[in-house]
Amino acid sequence: MTTNYIFVTGGVVSSLGKGIAAASLAAILEARGLNVTIMKLDPYINVDPGTMSPTQHGEVFVTEDGAETDLDLGHYERFIRTKMTRRNNFTTGRIYSEVLRKERRGDYLGATIQVIPHITNAIKERIIEGGEGHDVVLVEIGGTVGDIESLPFLEAIRQMAVDVGREHTLYMHLTLVPYLAAAGEVKTKPTQHSVKELLSIGIQPDVLICRSDRAVPANERAKIALFCNVPEKAVISLKDVDSIYKIPGLLKSQGLDDYICKRFSLTCPEANLAEWEQVLYEESNPGGEVTIGMIGKYVELPDAYKSVIEALKHGGLKNRLTVNIKLIDSQDVETRGEEMLKELDAILIPGGFGYRGVEGKVLAARYAREHNIPYLGICLGMQVALMEFARNVAGMENANSTEFVPDCKYPVVALITEWRDEDGNVEIRTEESDLGGTMRVGGQQCHLTEGSLVRQMYGEPTIVERHRHRYEVNNMLLKQIEAAGLRVAGRSADNKLVEIIELPDHPWFVACQFHPEFTSTPRDGHPLFAGFVKAAGDYQKRQVK
């Protein structure tokens, strides 16, 4: 099998949506029967995003095999069926770490280690390794052309055309085509200069994606084609849209997939986008709306909860409901109390780290429990629900987690010091372990309790969901909590770790230690989010009555 590579770069400004554009193109190519995957190359020095602030970098997306990756990989999995792995994302930091490790071992036999060829070779090796077994690999280069940090990656992808053949490489460049109200027209000069910058590196783009708040007129696209040495049919207008799931259709309508298939000499049927048309139909024809409050500590940057937000929308699609998400700072709940939680049809508490805002989350969990409001707790959201129940129902005064109060009397949540990974190897963690790369992370089996609400929603006895945490329910105190009315609805494969809890006497109160948002997609949804949004709609109807 010959693998073809599409390298996606961005120019003029950041945040043009390279990841969405790449994922949308991948969705069309997949719909043509091609085996497609997507990679993200990040130019920052961090080894991975695992220890980066969510308010700076957004969420950390966890893959099935336990890699902590860029949030763009979440977009990739929501658009295509291929599951991402640790091969699909790497950073400058990881590349340099590997090269330096080899140098220390003496692998380079005393050679002077340089960016070219050692760093660029390592990058190319990673790209080729990640693309094995696929017809087409889309490779998104993080950052903006012109950034110093991106230069080794750009040089590596320039060399790829030499290594694998120009006929198997395509360069797709996203640029901004701004509209100037004073002039009453779009301006192409920024795009021309961005392409000039790319040419100075040795890369001639084959496709230009022109991002604008409106459709770029044909005459302006012809002008861009002339000055940038790109065929007119390869200059694509990509305007702002109210739903990212419209983008595959927009790209297909301009023949981008046909152009690429011809460029790679690929013979494949026309793309069938019926599934995406169904998603858009469900999105544009809701039967009602619900308001769900998300109580978090990183709410100033919604991207910190990107997959949760998307999963809630997917749950809305499956119930033909528009989901209005109200982001609420958990510290505001601490200071202003229950007034922050009124007018909500459901409450969701997502994952997080650190004690700041935790008591606000505990208060929100109590409010949901006492007022029969649907509640979904994820990761830390399960732990605070357990703390709240232990304190106010099970009689464990000031019950807490050892993450926040190490010497508390009732440590209902405690550090996992030992477990087995997916290969059966024993993992050991202590308070002294590094923060990076030391969590229980990735896909883990969970056995669902017969007769539980979650068993009913999933429709099967065993599931696999993705984790990212260090702390777990303390089994030593579990019997007292269960005796007070809490039900364990799911356990780990070895039956030692509590994965899901429910309140049988509550209309819909579910909390899980894993992150179900990472496996939700617009086409398939997710059982927990579909059930949660349905419960929000049912609660709203009860309130009206």
UniProtKB/Swiss-Prot annotation:
Catalysed reaction, written as an equation: UTP + L-glutamine + ATP + H2O = CTP + L-glutamate + ADP + phosphate + 2 H(+); L-glutamine + H2O = L-glutamate + NH4(+); UTP + NH4(+) + ATP = CTP + ADP + phosphate + 2 H(+)
GO MF term list: ATP binding; CTP synthase activity; glutaminase activity; identical protein binding; metal ion binding
Notes on activation and inhibition: Allosterically activated by GTP, when glutamine is the substrate; GTP has no effect on the reaction when ammonia is the substrate. The allosteric effector GTP functions by stabilizing the protein conformation that binds the tetrahedral intermediate(s) formed during glutamine hydrolysis. Inhibited by the product CTP, via allosteric rather than competitive inhibition.
Pfam families recorded: CTP_synth_N, GATase
GO BP terms: 'de novo' CTP biosynthetic process; CTP biosynthetic process; pyrimidine nucleobase biosynthetic process
Broad enzyme group: ligase
Keyword ATP-binding: yes
UniProt pathway: Pyrimidine metabolism; CTP biosynthesis via de novo pathway; CTP from UDP: step 2/2
Keywords assigned: ATP-binding, Glutamine amidotransferase, Ligase, Magnesium, Metal-binding, Nucleotide-binding, Pyrimidine biosynthesis
GO cellular component: cytosol
Binding site residues for Mg(2+): 72, 140
EC number, as in UniProt: 6.3.4.2
Entry binding sites for UTP: 14, 187-192, 223
Chain positions covered by the region annotation Amidoligase domain: 2-266
Binding residues for ATP: 15-20, 72, 239-241
Residue positions binding CTP: 14, 147-149, 187-192, 223
Domain Glutamine amidotransferase type-1, first and last residues per copy: 291-542
Residues engaged in binding L-glutamine: 352, 380-383, 403, 470
Residues the record marks as active site: 379, 515, 517
Magnesium found in the keyword field: yes
HAMAP family membership: PyrG
Function: Catalyzes the ATP-dependent amination of UTP to CTP with either L-glutamine or ammonia as the source of nitrogen. Regulates intracellular CTP levels through interactions with the four ribonucleotide triphosphates.
Quaternary structure and partners: Homotetramer.
Family: Belongs to the CTP synthase family.
Additional information: CTPSs have evolved a hybrid strategy for distinguishing between UTP and CTP. The overlapping regions of the product feedback inhibitory and substrate sites recognize a common feature in both compounds, the triphosphate moiety. To differentiate isosteric substrate and product pyrimidine rings, an additional pocket far from the expected kinase/ligase catalytic site, specifically recognizes the cytosine and ribose portions of the product inhibitor.
Protein name, per record: CTP synthase
